[in-house]
Structures are given as C-alpha cells and as structure tokens.
Amino acid sequence: MELLIAYLDDPAGHNMAKFLSQEMTLDGDIFRGKYYDLIIIPTPAIFADWIEEKFDYDGFVFLSKHAAASGVLALTCHNTGNFSEAKFGGNDRQVAVPHAFLQKTYLQTLKKHQSQFSQFQITIEATHHGPTALTKPSIFIEIGTTEQQWTDTSLCNSVATLVHQV
C-alpha cells in the first residue's frame, strides 16, 4: 500500500489531499483508504527523509505544487534526488529509489485526459530535490505553476481524481 503525503502549507498538495481525504476514514493523523493512506505533514515535503522511519508503506507519493520561473503551466511528476549539492532538501549526491511504475501509469493517465488540461504541459521533471534517503519508491506529483493554479480547487480536484485512478 502507498502513503500519499501533502505538506500543510503547500496549497496544491493540501488541496489535492483535502479532496482525496473526503472518501477516507481518519485514524489519528492518518486518513485510511482502500488502496492508499494519506497524511498531511507540518514540514516541507522536500525535507521528509524521516517519513520512512515513522510510516511503513510500500512507497511514498508526495502531492505538491510546482514552481517555475518561466511561468509555463505544467502538470509534472518526478522522482527525488540530488546529483550534486542538496540545495532543496535531501543529501548531496544521493538519489532516492524511483517509483517508475507509478510514474509511467500516472503519465499515461494524464495523457489520456490531456484535453481536460489543454493549457498545461505534461512533463517529467528532472530530479532536483529531497527527500533522498528513502529506501522505498517515491515520487512527487505536482501542479504548476503559480498560486493561481495551486489554489484552483477544481484543477487540484481533477488531478487528485487521476491520482486516485492510478
């Protein structure tokens, strides 16, 4: 079973988590579901190298915002790691275990529903941040690129629906 993770102060991740949690049962801090569980954490997801010590799951899916200086609208996903200096969480020169199957399935699902997201680029982003120390597969699923998209509950709900499908 997978654990979906959203950072409380990440508007896109938190919006996706709120939507997904509606059909789940709250058990302490964990929303329990049939196919995956969900937590909302109080610290940035890029620094969540600790998550595996506290939660035992087959893999980790981080729901998050995507930011880009270009301003290009994007729905993206990527595995985590740092090929050089760790400027955004994780450890220097460490790459986490990729969640290749989920990445492939999510991208195929996005492509199948591309008309619903016609103004967005659908991309695999380069690996560039933490967490990096996880030994189970992990992936970030992101909505970009500005606060307008991150706070668009309709968009976040649509992406969350696709996450639920995969």
Task: Name the predicted role of every residue range.
Residues M1-H129, A133, T146-E147, T153-N157, ...:
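N-terminal catalytic or cofactor-binding beta/alpha core of small enzyme domains
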